[in-house]
Amino acid sequence: MQEYIDIVTEDNKIIGKALRSECHENPRLIHRAAHILVFNSAGQLLLQKRSMNKDIQPGKWDTSVGGHVGSGESYEKAAYRELEEELGIKNVNLDYLYDYKMRNEIESENIRSYFCKFDGRIDFNKDEIDEIRFWEIVEIKKQLGSGIFTPNFEQEFELYLNMVSHNKE
């Protein structure tokens, strides 16, 4: 099935649409993605290990949930859809965290991130994810820069830490 996603300007205005595959071949085609940081009650962050079959960053630990916003879809609707598709989680509350931009040689994304607290059973999508695990924040900090995480997750994690430390002040 061909997946269309909206193409946007730097300031997130929709200017067209393109196939997902086209967006991954052309970093000038800025598109939207939704991410969710899933925490448990102990304050541990769930990370997913990307399937070795993925075309981008296979086998690396990544944000709890992440996916493209479909053409005509809202960030929030995409976040809930991806949460259910990737982890089998539904009927939870998502809290907005922040927006940020991710740019690299492969693609350009305007990302909206959400927070979710969840302690229930997780039935992850084994076609997209090889493994899931809750991590202590200090453990993630120690591993930053070691090559086990996707560069995008490391960017996201730093943003989250900055937001949390700013809110404590």
Q: For each of these PLM feature ranges, what is it?
A:
Residues M1-H35, S41:
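Acidic, metal-coordinating catalytic segment for phosphate/diphosphate chemistry
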Residues E22, S71, Y98, E105-E169:
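Nudix hydrolase/Nudix homology domain
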Residues N26-R28, I56-K60, F134-E136:
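A short, polar/proline- and glycine-enriched secondary-structure boundary/capping micro-motif
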Residues A33-V65:
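A glycine-rich, hydrophobic loop/mini-helix early in the fold
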Residues A42, M52, S74-E76, E84-I122:
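Active-site segment of metal-dependent pyrophosphate-handling enzymes
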